[in-house]
Amino acid sequence: MPLDPGCLNGRVMKCLTFFLLLPETLKKSRKSARAQGKVQACYEIVPLALKKKMAAELYPASANTNIANSNAAANAKKNALQLQQAAPPPPQLHNLNNNNIESGNWQSFHPTLRERNALMFNNELMADVHFIVGPAGASKKVPVHKYILAVGSSVFYAMFYGDLAEVKSEIHIPDVEPAAFLILLKYLYSDEIDLEADTVLATLYAAKKYIVPALAKACVNFLETSLEAKNACVLLSQSRLFEEPDLTLRCWEVIDAQAELALKSEGFCEIDLQTLEIIVTRETLNTKEDVVFEAVLNWAEAECKRQGLSITPVNKRNVLGKALYLVRIPTMTLEEFANGAAQSDILTLEETRSIFLWYTAANKPQLEFPLIKRKGLAPQRCHRFQSSAYRSNQWRYRGRCDSIQFAVDKRIFIAGLGLYGSSCGKAEYSVKIELKRQGAVLAQNLTKFVSDGSSNTFSVWFEHPVQVEQDTFYTVSAILDGNELSYFGQEGMTEVQCGKVTFQFQCSSDSTNGTGVQGGQIPELIFYA
């Protein structure tokens, strides 16, 4: 059986080590001999038996030591080296199976400190402690390296190297989700942030708990980017819990502008009672009060289910507590109250009677509900023309599309359009308005408006305000059907400053009726910011 080249190399190294140490050994031996009054011979230092043993290790009797075999060993070593040099580059961090180091010389394949640290992520190699992460029955055992965690988090530093440092080999963390904890560790080991929608809140909790502000900020930015009406109420609740004022402010922007969508979302029914009270108290909710009342009832039903209570009017009142009396029921129209709250059974007979009397009687009874209507949000208007004009032979509607593209430098909510009407007296128009982004329709509405013959603009609204992101071009269109002669805008501007928002305009290929940047229809964009 031929000798393994690896074994041969090992024995050569032993011999080489011996000869490197030989001069020092000779010096020590001579000094010892002088001290004893005699000089030792070299054969006493290197006995013949030892020489034979070393020779046997280098060239065992079972091995063929002819030149051909030596050349074969050299060739094998050369081939192994070539294979090593031709090895593929190390895989990306997220593909690493970190409990299977690829070779005994793995350090040479990872030239940077970050790569080498990243290879240790979730790796048993050199791990000096384990975390048991997650609740009992759903926990995960995670290997970690104290030093890496300690240099990335003051909490971990205190845990491992502080005055009250943990000495256990396993540390239990039942309040953190395993997936979120691994995202935290991946950042500490490699600076990589790999966030996902279904774990970002749990990751934010972990980042806050272990004081890793860069990861916490990344989580907040991720949440702000994904924020929309259907999750705004839940994120508001979480932002208050995590004390993230910027995220809280963004949540309020969405909830105020898209209040009806937010209150009708499933997420609204998942919030805590305190957040419910804060939302219902909000002065700037941009919706009708019967929508608020219906949302509160839906929340009460969901809360009864969470508490294991039967869904009855009494239990709904009990779980709501004072929140019921934050709804501004008297600000509904009489019709809205009669068709909604009065038939809900959650109000007592006395409360229902008193509210009806408040609507109709000269001597109004005192009510426990707020009487003042919410202010809502005041819409803002971006006017893109400096003047308007009318020429009988120039601007007509024939069911063609008027369209313009726009972009903004901060997030806003487009609520509708301001349009020119007839230049020949009072007239009614049917109109279809549309908002698109990169060809995808975000909102549209088919409605009517009446113009009075003046050059004023007339508002046409989308069903719900639409969130518009910054630095992206959107297309608004209007197709009018009615009196053919109309006012039109002149001296159009490519850039308009409107409050804190800057609008940019450019022509749209969808426009087939002559509207462009310099003139035409769609003089105003109506928005909330």
Swiss-Prot record:
A Pfam family reported for this protein in Swiss-Prot or TrEMBL: BACK
Assigned keywords, A-Z: Cytoplasm
CDD domains attached to this UniProt entry: BACK_BTBD6, BTB_POZ_BTBD6
The BTB domain, residue ranges: 127-197
Top-level taxonomic group: Eukaryota
Keyword Cell division: no
Keyword Nucleus: no
PROSITE patterns assigned: BTB
GO CC terms of this entry: cytoplasm
Gene3D superfamilies cross-referenced by the UniProt entry: 1.25.40.420, PHR domain, Potassium Channel Kv1.1, Chain A
Known role: Adapter protein for the cul3 E3 ubiquitin-protein ligase complex. Involved in late neuronal development and muscle formation.
Protein name (record): BTB/POZ domain-containing protein 6
Organism whose genome encodes this protein: Xenopus tropicalis (Western clawed frog)
Designated gene of the protein: btbd6
